Design a protein with these regions (language model features):
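Active-site glycine-rich loop that binds ribose-phosphate moieties when present
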Residues: 107-112, 117-119, 131-138, 162, ...
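Glycine-rich adenosine-cofactor-binding loop
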Residues: 11, 100-105, 120-145, 152-154
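Residues at the starts of beta-strands that form the adenosine-phosphate
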Residues: 6, 123, 146-147, 176
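NAD(P)-binding Rossmann-fold cofactor-contacting core
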Residues: 143-172
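Short beta-strand elements in bilobed, periplasmic/extracellular small-molecule ligand-binding domains
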Residues: 31-39, 148-149, 173, 177
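Conserved acidic residues
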Residues: 59, 146, 193-196
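Rossmann-like adenosine-cofactor binding region
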Residues: 174-225
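Phosphate/diphosphate ligand-binding glycine-rich loop within oxidoreductases
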Residues: 2-115, 225
Length: 225
């Protein structure tokens, strides 16, 4: 219609994405006059696309690889987590001002709260240091976790995780953050025994995993005595 609001996904490639079908179904189910499209935008094209968002009044976008860092560099304002990580996966257009968010951590913490669990003052253990896991680490620290212990193999993510740990410490000095190799078995047992929250959560977004966990909700979550 003449008032249809436009939303989208930017990345490259995006032709395989299920996001348009999912989002447009949601618009229809909720009676929203909106349309969600996938835009194949390469990293070097992000600045021009951002200008187009203002020109065409695109209300918001999700951002996928390889554009998350470039998008963050072209925002008017970043959420605390996005600023710390230096990447965004969501852009919101409010009257021509673009706000960048990284929502993985926000969604994780919000879902815990929905299940009656808060992270403030808690000792947390996280396995993994990829993109989503990093966002979760950052959000838990920003939301008042007492300590965060990260275990990750010495893969390409490990060195990046070391740098992120130092950034979190500088931003949230009251939160104790440590990074260990997966081979540190004794430390792993010690930290798990001392942790306040044990969570088994599937944050993988692909067809195979959806067969086991179609809605990506918490599988097990409980407070330790």
């Amino acid at each position: 219609s003449g008032t249809t609001k436009l939303f989208g996904l930017i990345g490259s490639p995006v032709s395989h994405s299920a996001s348009p079908a999912m989002q447009n179904y949601g618009f229809q189910a909720c009676g929203v006059d909106g349309a969600y499209l996938a835009f194949d935008i390469k990293e070097e094209e992000v600045p021009e696309f951002v200008k187009s968002m203002r020109l065409l009044n695109i209300q918001g976008c999700n951002v996928t690889m390889p554009n998350k860092t470039a998008a963050a560099q072209n925002m008017d304002e970043l959420s605390p987590a996005a600023e710390l990580i230096g990447a965004v996966n969501t852009i919101v257009n409010r009257d021509g001002k673009l706000y960048g968010h990284i929502t993985d951590g926000e969604g994780f913490v919000a879902n815990l709260k929905d299940h009656g669990i808060g992270v403030e003052g808690k000792d947390i253990v996280i396995f993994g240091a990829g993109g989503a896991a990093t966002a979760i680490q950052v959000q838990c620290a920003l939301d008042g976790a007492k300590s965060i212990t990260i275990f990750n193999p010495r893969d390409p993510f490990f060195e990046r995780a070391q740098k992120m740990v130092e950034k979190i410490k500088a931003k949230v000095p009251e939160c104790q953050v440590e990074l260990y190799d997966l081979d540190a078995k004794d430390t792993m047992r010690e930290k798990i025994d001392a942790a306040d929250i044990l969570v088994k959560w599937n944050i993988t977004w692909n067809e195979t995993k959806r067969r086991y966990n179609s809605d990506l909700q918490i599988q097990q979550c409980f407070m330790k005595d």
